[in-house]
Amino acid sequence: MKIAAFDIGGTALKMGVVLPHGEIILTKSAEIIASDGDQILAEMKLFLAENTDVTGIAVSAPGYVNPKTGLITMGGAIRRFDNFNLKEWLEAETGLPVAIENDANCALLAEKWLGKGQDLDDFLCLTIGTGIGGGIFSNGALVRGGRFRAGEFGYMFSERPGAFRPGKYTLNETTTMLVLRRQYAQLTGRPLKEITGEEIFANYDAHDPISERLINEFYTGICTGLYNLIYLFDPTHIFIGGGITSRPTFITELKHHMASFGLRDTIIETATHKNQAGLLGAVYHFLQEENRHE
């Protein structure tokens, strides 16, 4: 059996062919312009036309995803996918079985299937990028919530909200790599497009005062979220993903800041699969669905 896997993002579509034991035998990616949902659908059709020997389709998608019906009630940055049933569309186009799951849940399922969560019953995954996402595995099961919105950790408040536009006090608005770059651009008077997270952290290592202040605030925001999650879910482990985790000293620095919060005994580590987590988690969900229907 070969499974076509898709990991849908607002700026890129990752595609692959994966075997049932988790070996990825082919990968491809496409840049997505302006979160264009129609372009995503066209790229998926093209990939499937190029790989006619696949026998199923596994999808990792952003937003609020009903994995039972395939309906995406809110597509995140991809507004074309609001109230769109991607599972039904793919099945009609190909005649193949399709399984779809939320992207953050797929990252968690990859960790459960072929990562550090294989023997764990209570753990969380937290992803730090342009936004903050997450997945919850509690009492031996993935937690999706009554409306498939569980794990939207980025909507937690990072500080006491003001009366006007309280959403600007959430982790998504205060503690992401995009926010860090915007803050640095504002303070230095440089264009945002010229600034990378790598540059800011390099300046932090060189003891640049602006970078030190911003990154200390960045870590404090992450620790605030972790503190809340630890006391909400009592996980034994939290695995963190996102480009920031490629920094060798990230976990050490995070734990240093976390010490003042009272870390307790929760183990915090980086996630295993990096950019392949979405593809692998989608395939694991597909295999679970196939087994359930047999």
From Swiss-Prot:
EC class of the enzyme, as a word: transferase
Record-listed ATP binding positions: 5-11
Disulphide-bridged cysteine pairs: none
Residues annotated as signal peptide: none
Keywords tagged on the record: ATP-binding, Carbohydrate metabolism, Kinase, Nucleotide-binding, Transferase
InterPro entries per the UniProt record, alphabetical: ATPase_NBD, ROK
EC number of this enzyme: 2.7.1.85
Reactions catalysed, as given in the entry: D-cellobiose + ATP = 6-phospho-beta-D-glucosyl-(1->4)-D-glucose + ADP + H(+)
Pfam family, one: ROK
Origin: domain of life: Bacteria
GO molecular function: ATP binding; beta-glucoside kinase activity
Family note: Belongs to the ROK (NagC/XylR) family.
Physiological role: Catalyzes the ATP-dependent phosphorylation of cellobiose to produce cellobiose-6'-P. May have a dual role of kinase and transcriptional regulator of the cellobiose-PTS operon.
Name of the protein in its database record: Beta-glucoside kinase
Source organism: Listeria innocua serovar 6a (strain ATCC BAA-680 / CLIP 11262)
